[in-house]
């Protein structure tokens, strides 16, 4: 390679929240795949210390040709908690300037997302029996990973940041123009290295990874998992927002005698939703385990924080707490209404008894 030349690949992840659950065993049967073990079927398998409870199912899909003539390799990945990831990969060789321009064009463009949506729709038509409660409308997230395997001179991570920190920051931001010193510093603060010869810089919608193919496999998977979690928590946030809006409308109609019986039905629906969302969030939250690997755990926390998982997770928890309080209030209102009815019945029975008693004496 000539000086300042890079070799690697660009990975584009377009994730869709398509259903409440994917039955992976049924999916494997439909796709004609062998039953999987507990390990994810990576192109380069992750180490033993990073483990999925239910490994996502992968399948190769058709290649996609962009308007520029670039040809992207395609893969689909199905997660059991209802997320479909459409992954594209483009081999890259060139200068830092070329990679900066490529990042700016991909991050700002929409052509790849349209191809991803088309492939997702085609795929889901084939595997419909494996989908539990498919959604009519899909939320989606996109993420770009610029994986550099080789750099002339084999610089260490500190040398790379010192010599090419400006370009790395531009790549992670998806900006063709130079960044200010403050922006550059903010981007590079979100960097990690396991050894002097590797580096990952994580941004909210893109990441720069300098590592071997085998070494980068876990990093790439953790970045994808963090984005799938973000998608799930965004979905739960929307579901809870809609349900709470309906509850507030019911409460605005009053809590009179008849309204309290209506609140009983609303509280039952709310309680069912509470249980469902709690179960589903726990499943998405605990889908991956780190077995005595603190670096991968720290890398995941960094990735999750950058893409916004904790923010949406907190929003969901706040709305779950609000829903729990509203449920208790509605149940209390219903019990008060029922107690009033029972007391009224007792009084009516006593009055009837007294009437018959006095009539008998008369």
Give residue spans per PLM region.
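Membrane-associated alpha-helical segments
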Residues: 235-353, 360
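Short Lys/Arg-enriched alpha/beta "domain-start" segment
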Residues: 1-198
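Short secondary-structure boundary segments
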Residues: 27-52, 216-235, 352-359
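Mixed-charge, polar/low-complexity N-terminal
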Residues: 66, 181-183, 188-190, 220, ...
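Short, surface-exposed, polar/charged, turn-prone segments marking secondary-structure boundaries
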Residues: 41-42, 113-117, 230, 236-239, ...
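Extended, charged amphipathic alpha-helical segments
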Residues: 164-261
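Generic detector of well-ordered alpha-helical segments enriched in charged/polar residues
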Residues: 25-28, 100, 117, 121-129, ...
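Low-complexity, flexible helical/coil segments
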Residues: 48-50, 120-127, 244-247, 351-352, ...
């Amino acid at each position: 390679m000539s000086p300042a030349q890079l070799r690697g690949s660009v990975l584009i992840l377009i994730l869709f929240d398509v259903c409440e659950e994917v039955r992976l065993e049924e999916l494997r049967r439909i796709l004609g795949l062998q039953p999987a073990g507990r390990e994810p079927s990576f192109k380069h398998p992750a180490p033993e210390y990073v483990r999925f409870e239910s490994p996502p199912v992968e399948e190769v899909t058709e290649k996609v040709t962009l308007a520029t003539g670039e040809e992207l390799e395609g893969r689909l990945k199905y997660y059991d908690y209802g997320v479909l990831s459409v992954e594209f990969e483009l081999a890259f060789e060139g200068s830092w300037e070329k990679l900066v321009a490529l990042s700016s064009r991909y991050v700002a463009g929409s052509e790849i997302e349209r191809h991803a949506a088309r492939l997702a729709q085609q795929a889901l038509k084939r595997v419909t029996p494996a989908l539990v409660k498919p959604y009519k409308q899909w939320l989606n997230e996109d993420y770009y990973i610029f994986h550099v395997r080789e750099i002339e001179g084999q610089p260490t991570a500190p040398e790379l940041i010192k010599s090419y920190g400006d370009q790395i920051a531009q790549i992670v931001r998806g900006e063709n123009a130079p960044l200010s010193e403050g922006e550059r510093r903010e981007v590079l603060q979100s960097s990690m290295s396991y050894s002097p010869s590797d580096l990952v810089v994580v941004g909210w919608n893109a990441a720069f990874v300098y590592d071997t193919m085998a070494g980068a496999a876990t990093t790439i998977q953790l970045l994808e998992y963090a984005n799938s979690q973000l998608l799930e928590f965004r979905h739960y946030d929307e579901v809870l927002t809609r349900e709470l809006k309906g509850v507030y409308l019911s409460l605005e109609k009053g809590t009179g005698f008849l309204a309290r019986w209506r609140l009983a039905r609303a509280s039952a629906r709310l309680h069912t939703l509470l249980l469902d969302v709690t179960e589903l969030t726990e499943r998405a939250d605990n889908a991956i385990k780190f077995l005595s690997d603190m670096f991968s755990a720290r890398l995941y926390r960094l990735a999750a924080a950058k893409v916004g998982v904790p923010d949406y997770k907190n929003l969901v928890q706040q709305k779950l707490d609000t829903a729990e309080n509203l449920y208790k209030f509605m149940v209390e209102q219903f019990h008060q209404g029922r107690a009033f009815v029972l007391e009224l019945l007792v009084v009516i029975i006593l009055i009837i008894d007294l009437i018959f008693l006095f009539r008998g004496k008369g």
